Amino acid sequence: MFQAMGELDGADVKAVESATRERVAAQLASGEYTGWLVEIDGAPIAGAGVLLHQYHPTRQNPDGRPTAYILNVYTDPLHRRAGLATRLIETILAWCRERDIPRASLHTSEWGRPVYERLGFVPTHELRLELTNRVRTGSLP
């Protein structure tokens, strides 16, 4: 997935994949992360996940319920444009609604933006400051 998006290559991919496997395994065990896969004959062709974040209560979320961050949305190139990402996101949103999760957010590529906008996602005014300008390798925090 990281290579397909052009984010990492070579040794960086291996380091990030290893750290991701460890982190996701722990988050799956704790219930903090839930993932969905689409398979054909036992081989994954698409997937997505949701990571629950606990924030302090706010005006929009007065009881401080966890919010959902959707990530790891990926469809194998041979199976794109078949609506798999849309169905995965619809499944995740239904899962969130069943749990009374008040908000779902995500980051998207330009390719994915139309999918999310059709499902009702809107841009927000989030700001970000990168505190390091280097790609970390090895053990990631």
Each language-model region and where it sits:
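Conserved GNAT-fold acetyl-CoA-binding loop/helix
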Residues: 2-24
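Conserved beta-strand in the GNAT
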Residues: 37, 43-52, 69, 74
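Conserved catalytic-core motifs of GNAT/GCN5-like acyltransferases
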Residues: 55-58, 105-107, 111, 117, ...
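Conserved acetyl-CoA binding element of GNAT-fold acetyltransferases
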Residues: 61-77, 129
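Conserved GNAT acetyl-CoA-binding A-motif
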Residues: 89, 96-108
